[in-house]
Amino acid sequence: MVFSRNRKRAFLSILCIIYFIMIFIITIFEREPGSRTGISLTLFETLGGPRANAYVIENILLFIPFGFFVPKMWKCLRRLPVCVFAGFCFSLAIEVTQLLTQRGHFQVDDILMNTIGAGIGAVIGLIRFRKPN
């Protein structure tokens, strides 16, 4: 049993590492430095139109794995509000990195949608991994 638990944890660790690498590739390293600049602090400013709506869906989907896997890795993030806050902080870190490296626009809409995605993933994880009574 211990071997199987360690094996499962190792597998989850590898998945988390791959997920974080993919997030950084998609949100930062895939873009040329200095190619995108700007700050959007107005909530819902980027919504509307098919392309913008696709970005909304993309941002939500991008963070569902965060909410799903991260609480399984770190016990301190197993409560829903804590996990959602961690998703917010991770999203904020990405947006600040994009701003500082000029590899993306800093948008509060992205932070909101990413946080929603982390929350959805956390709820799915809580339901999926709930212990039976």
Where are these regions (language model features)?
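Bulky hydrophobic segments
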Residues: 1-108, 122-133
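Small-residue-rich transmembrane alpha-helices that serve as helix-helix interface/gating elements
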Residues: 112-120
